[in-house]
């Protein structure tokens, strides 16, 4: 919005040309989201407390968590407001990628909000059923995947429609342009054509998987938000590179026109995330809830698909992956041993993985900071793929 206003007035006020610089708007988007979060945070927390939107704590979990009972949840609303307002202020409204990422983010946020609302307001411990939640995640994920399959390689929505019609006329056999191929990090000559259906399936898995993985990681004070900020910021760097004809050519990446504008969204996400951490640091004054975790995970997955860095997201989000795999292994092993031996056995003291380390003697703050450090290392490895190819 501010970009359009500045472009309209810049002939009379030359200093407004600074709005044409993506990096300037990215910095301002981050600062705006940070100020919104810090400014409205106390009000949101106070309001959630008045509404008695308190988090229930499992009695069979780490005993140190019992003191958290009643801490207001659904604080992810604060993050989403900061991201949405800042992005709409500083991003180019004509950019189609901004709108699809906002759609996924706010759509998944709505799913999480309904789930949280049922849990804490209606006192329904189950919230949304797994089937209902998965259904709506699938609807949004498939819509985004189908659009991006024809959008990533094109420069406008008209070209998206033309490519779609070409695919239909070809009997659904048309291969997508090379820009839509799966990029293998560290190898500049290797990429895999996916086809329309392959692209849609992979995109769906990345978006839905990332959303749920981030949600599983959100279990300790400050644990999930810093990895989200770090990974999101790194994806912003990739977006800037892929959106630049000069940098993408120099670093041997496909040029994706319009992808650079996602740096605005990533910067807003970083600012909003740091503001939330101010209140979520141990001992937390507010929890994120599904409304924030599902949304942020969906955003990371969508951005990774647009900038063709699905595998790099898997690397940088290694903590999210480890948390998810620990749950899958725990459930699978428990069911297998119960069927085989008549009693369920566990691989970990408790899943997700962060609870295993807590029950192994690590303090909550140790788990959180060590997971942050691991994420920093993985993000640096991911960023190194920009040049080490």
From Swiss-Prot:
It is a multi-pass membrane protein. Keywords: Cell cycle, Cell division, Cell inner membrane, Cell membrane, Cell shape, Cell wall biogenesis/degradation, Magnesium, Membrane, Metal-binding, Peptidoglycan synthesis, Transferase, Transmembrane, Transmembrane helix. Pathway: Cell wall biogenesis; peptidoglycan biosynthesis. It catalyses: UDP-N-acetyl-alpha-D-muramoyl-L-alanyl-gamma-D-glutamyl-meso-2,6-diaminopimeloyl-D-alanyl-D-alanine + di-trans,octa-cis-undecaprenyl phosphate = di-trans,octa-cis-undecaprenyl diphospho-N-acetyl-alpha-D-muramoyl-L-alanyl-D-glutamyl-meso-2,6-diaminopimeloyl-D-alanyl-D-alanine + UMP. It is an enzyme of class 2 (transferase). Its EC number is 2.7.8.13. Its cofactor is Mg(2+). The chain crosses the membrane at residues 25-45, 74-94, 97-117, 134-154, 190-210, 222-242, 259-279, 286-306, 311-331, 366-386. One of its GO terms (biological process) is regulation of cell shape. GO terms for cellular component: plasma membrane. Catalyzes the initial step of the lipid cycle reactions in the biosynthesis of the cell wall peptidoglycan: transfers peptidoglycan precursor phospho-MurNAc-pentapeptide from UDP-MurNAc-pentapeptide onto the lipid carrier undecaprenyl phosphate, yielding undecaprenyl-pyrophosphoryl-MurNAc-pentapeptide, known as lipid I. Belongs to the glycosyltransferase 4 family. MraY subfamily. This is Phospho-N-acetylmuramoyl-pentapeptide-transferase. It comes from Ralstonia pickettii (strain 12J). The gene is mraY.
């Amino acid at each position: 919005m501010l970009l359009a206003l500045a472009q309209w007035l810049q002939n009379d006020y030359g200093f407004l040309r600074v709005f044409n610089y993506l990096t300037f708007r990215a910095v301002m988007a981050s600062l705006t989201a940070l100020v919104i979060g810090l400014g409205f945070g106390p009000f949101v927390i106070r309001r959630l407390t008045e509404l008695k939107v308190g988090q229930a704590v499992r009695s069979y979990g780490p005993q140190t968590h019992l003191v958290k009972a009643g801490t207001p949840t659904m604080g992810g609303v604060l993050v989403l407001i900061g991201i949405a307002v800042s992005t709409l202020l500083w991003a180019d409204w004509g950019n189609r990628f901004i709108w699809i990422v906002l759609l996924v983010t706010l759509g998944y946020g709505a799913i999480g909000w309904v789930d949280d609302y049922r849990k804490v307001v209606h006192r329904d411990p189950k919230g949304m059923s797994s089937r209902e939640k998965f259904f709506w995640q699938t609807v949004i994920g498939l819509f985004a995947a189908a659009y991006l399959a024809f959008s990533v390689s094109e420069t406008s929505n008209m070209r998206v429609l033309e490519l779609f019609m070409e695919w239909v006329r070809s009997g659904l056999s048309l291969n997508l342009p090379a820009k839509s191929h799966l990029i293998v990090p560290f190898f500049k000559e290797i990429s895999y054509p996916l086809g329309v259906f392959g692209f849609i399936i992979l995109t769906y898995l990345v978006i839905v998987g990332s959303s749920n993985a981030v949600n599983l990681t959100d279990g300790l004070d400050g644990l999930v938000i810093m990895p989200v900020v770090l990974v999101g910021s790194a994806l912003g760097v990739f977006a800037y590179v892929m959106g630049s004809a000069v940098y993408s050519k120099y670093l041997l990446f496909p040029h994706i026109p319009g992808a650079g504008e996602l740096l605005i969204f990533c910067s807003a996400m970083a600012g909003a995330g740091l503001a939330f951490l101010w209140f979520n640091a141990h001992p937390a004054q507010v929890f994120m809830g599904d409304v924030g975790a599902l949304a942020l995970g969906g955003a990371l997955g969508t951005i990774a698909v647009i900038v063709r860095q699905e595998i790099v997201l898997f690397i940088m989000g290694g903590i999210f992956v480890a948390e998810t795999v620990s749950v899958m292994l725990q459930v699978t092993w428990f069911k297998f041993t119960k069927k085989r031996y008549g009693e369920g056995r566990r691989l970990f003291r408790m899943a997700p993985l962060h609870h295993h380390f807590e029950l192994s003697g690590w303090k909550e703050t140790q788990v959180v900071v060590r997971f942050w450090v691991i994420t920093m290392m993985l993000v640096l490895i991911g960023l190194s793929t920009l040049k080490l190819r």
